[in-house]
């Protein structure tokens, strides 16, 4: 799985990715461009994922059978083969921060922006913890789910942008209808090839063909 030294290195890299992505200098760019916001949020989650995996490696290499806290964290990260930590909880966190009211909150106050960054990082940490204990088949299933969710979100944004073109209210006041539409297309196209690849890989890992 890894060594304590690799875990420490992962922690440093993860923190660096989050710090670089949550840079206040980039905040005005998020206000102007939804693709930029999606990219920055993705990097924050990725940084959190590196930290989560590093934490898993550290706990696995350092805890003893008497260490109830570490044992509890490792057990929790493996619930339903990692589905709770890697799929359900991160999805709920991300979904919450992409609701129109949450987007407005994160853009209109320092507290909102801070809570969003922390939440996205936590989503990544949870996924990283679960990743360490997953089988090869679950790795493929998780990557398939991540890209599938990205494509689904892209389709929702495309529909929102397309519907708004016909005159209904724009529920994302910081972004134009065109940005919603183009961001949706971007997310859908980017996810298409990985979804197909990991769907086939997952079936092979499961021995179906």
Describe the function of each predicted region.
Residues 1-209:
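Alpha-helical membrane segments of multi-pass proteins
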């Amino acid at each position: 799985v890894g060594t304590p030294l690799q875990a420490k290195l992962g922690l440093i890299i993860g923190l660096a990715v989050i710090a670089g992505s949550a840079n206040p200098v980039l905040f005005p760019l998020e206000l102007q461009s939804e693709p930029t916001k999606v990219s920055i949020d993705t990097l924050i989650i990725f940084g959190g994922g590196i930290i989560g995996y590093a934490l898993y490696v550290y706990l696995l290499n350092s805890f003893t059978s008497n260490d109830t806290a570490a044992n509890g964290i490792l057990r929790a990260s493996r619930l339903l083969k990692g589905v709770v930590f890697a799929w359900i909880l991160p999805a709920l966190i991300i979904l919450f921060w992409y609701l129109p009211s949450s987007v407005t909150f994160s853009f209109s106050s320092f507290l909102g922006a801070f809570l969003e960054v922390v939440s996205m990082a936590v989503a990544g940490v949870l996924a990283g913890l679960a990743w360490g204990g997953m089988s090869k088949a679950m790795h493929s299933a998780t990557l398939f789910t991540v890209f599938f969710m990205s494509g689904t979100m892209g389709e929702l944004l495309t529909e929102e942008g397309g519907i708004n073109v016909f005159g209904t209210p724009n529920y994302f006041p910081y972004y134009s209808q065109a940005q919603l539409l183009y961001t949706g297309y971007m997310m859908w196209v980017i996810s298409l090839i990985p979804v197909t690849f990991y769907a086939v890989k997952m079936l092979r890992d499961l021995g179906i063909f």
